[in-house]
């Protein structure tokens, strides 16, 4: 999501991001456990992506490298936790952080309190917690959140209702994308939305979580959880280098197969474009400008 936000921030006048609060690992997990605050890490990443005050954004992203208590904590996570505690509301704390950073857009947590991810695997077993999924390494079949039935914040529903286009960004399908859509009222808001709902397909599968998944299986997983909301699919069209493929093969990941006929049978339009960064040093990464340009193009075509 931050990659897409960085691409859109200077070209879209009214930008809103909805961010999962099911993270329970790393700095976010420690703050969640010790302070009872909703995990701020994913929210922080989106705030930083939209920040107008670049130096302050660098402070938010700074991580302590020493000290038993502060090691690996992101400064921004601590600030958001403090603001939420002072305001008595995680949602308001995020809003205050957004004003500090002078973000270009709005960032909304998908829920007003911490959620716990409940994961069901293809073999019928279940685990609780987002951070254990990749350690388990088994094929995921479905996820839910606890407590269940919580309504999404009113601001989230309002943002969907007012949108010209909704983009489901690339990322971990079962531990990031789908959990952000499970708040009460979100599925209904997307079902009545009459604009394009664009799913930006992951270029690579993830070991265990989506091993062997095609693009249509990603879309079907979203549909199984909230209904058939996607109208358009955006996929990368270029080839990957042999070195890059070998690097991901060692991680039990492979390119996501674009099964166009299956997608068209599901009633979704497929758009292929060059979406990746030319810099392969950090692996397969979407290019913010390329990705944003294609999302904007889809919005213009469909409006």
Predicted regions and their residues:
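Structural motif
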Residues: 167-169, 198-200, 234
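Electropositive, gly/pro-rich neighborhoods at or near active sites that engage anionic ligands
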Residues: 22-138, 294-297, 301
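A short, Lys/Arg-enriched amphipathic alpha-helix followed by its capping loop at the start of a domain
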Residues: 3-14
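C-terminal functional extensions of proteins
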Residues: 212-303
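Conserved phosphate- and dinucleotide-binding cores of soluble alpha/beta proteins
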Residues: 9-11, 19-36, 137, 152-153, ...
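Short, well-ordered alpha-helix to beta-strand connector turns
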Residues: 12, 104, 163-164, 194, ...
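Glycine-rich phosphate/diphosphate-binding loops and the adjacent beta-loop-alpha structural elements
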Residues: 61-89, 171-178, 204-210, 240, ...
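Active-site gating loop/helix substructures
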Residues: 109, 113-174
């Amino acid at each position: 999501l931050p990659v897409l936000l960085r691409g859109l921030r200077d070209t879209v006048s009214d930008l809103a991001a909805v961010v999962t609060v099911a993270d329970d690992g790393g700095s976010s997990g420690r703050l969640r456990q010790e302070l009872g605050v909703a995990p701020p890490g994913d929210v922080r990443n989106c705030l930083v992506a939209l920040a107008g005050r670049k130096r302050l954004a660098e402070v938010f992203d700074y991580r302590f490298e020493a000290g038993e208590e502060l090691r690996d904590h992101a400064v921004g996570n601590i600030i958001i936790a403090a603001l939420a505690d002072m305001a008595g509301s995680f949602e308001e704390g995020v809003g205050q952080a957004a004003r500090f950073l002078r973000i270009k857009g709005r960032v909304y947590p998908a829920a007003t309190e911490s959620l716990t991810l409940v994961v069901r695997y293809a073999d019928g077993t279940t685990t609780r917690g987002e951070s254990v999924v990749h350690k388990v390494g088994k094929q995921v079949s479905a996820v839910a959140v606890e407590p269940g039935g919580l309504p999404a914040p009113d601001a989230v529903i309002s943002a969907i209702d007012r949108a010209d286009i909704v983009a489901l960004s690339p990322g971990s399908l079962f531990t990031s994308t789908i959990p952000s859509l499970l708040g009460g009222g979100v599925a209904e808001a997307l079902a009545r939305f009459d604009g394009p709902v664009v799913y930006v397909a992951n270029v690579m599968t993830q070991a265990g979580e989506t091993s062997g998944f095609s693009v249509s299986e990603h879309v079907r997983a979203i549909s199984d959880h909230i209904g058939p909301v996607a109208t358009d699919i955006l996929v990368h069209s270029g080839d990957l280098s042999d070195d890059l493929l070998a690097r991901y093969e060692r991680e039990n990941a492979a390119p996501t197969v674009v099964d166009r006929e299956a997608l068209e049978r599901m009633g979704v339009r497929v758009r292929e474009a060059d979406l990746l960064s030319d810099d392969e040093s950090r692996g397969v990464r979407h290019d913010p400008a390329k990705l944003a340009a294609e999302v904007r193009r889809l919005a213009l075509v469909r409006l």
